[in-house]
């Protein structure tokens, strides 16, 4: 989590893919997290959530982009989705993951999720969900545009969306364009330590930097555009 410093006493996670599930557990051990300090469930996060009734201080994810899911109408009665009036489409589960994560986020917690740019502008049900999150709840805290070809298996550009339920800066949203902040590698692009530090400091200070970041204040006109 690059946006805040916290003391983590216990880690919870859920991953459907067996290989990624095992890699996640190995990653914990390689970073000196004792097996008694984490619980990672191997199941479908959307269809069979593992930690009902829990709330978490920090929620982070890099879910599969625009994955298919059931979008079963019965989910409209599920507490994770019921307040929105719409479900993410079967062909794109991006907003279903966002809704799932927000449900499990503590009121004073921070959530960060990596998703393709389409979540920022697609319409229909996704537009309804996005409008509810921004206009009704005012949960969106920042959008950080990342370089293309940053993650293994995909070359598409992505964004980090940061959400908070109780925002200190509730009258604005910070936009950071870090799409040109990378070091080109043989097969993938990489964020350098300097790139990461600049993103983190810009987020913490909520600075407007020419051609890099902009803090959008919610005026009456901006509210109409949300």
Locations of regions flagged by a protein language model:
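Short alpha-helix immediately C-terminal to the canonical SAM-binding loop
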Residues: 21
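Conserved SAM-binding motif I beta-strand of class I
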Residues: 11-15
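S-adenosyl-L-methionine
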Residues: 25-51
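Conserved beta-strand segments of alpha/beta enzyme cores
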Residues: 10, 37-39, 142
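Conserved S-adenosyl-L-methionine
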Residues: 3-9
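A conserved structural/catalytic subdomain of Rossmann-like adenosyl-cofactor enzymes
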Residues: 49, 53-220, 226
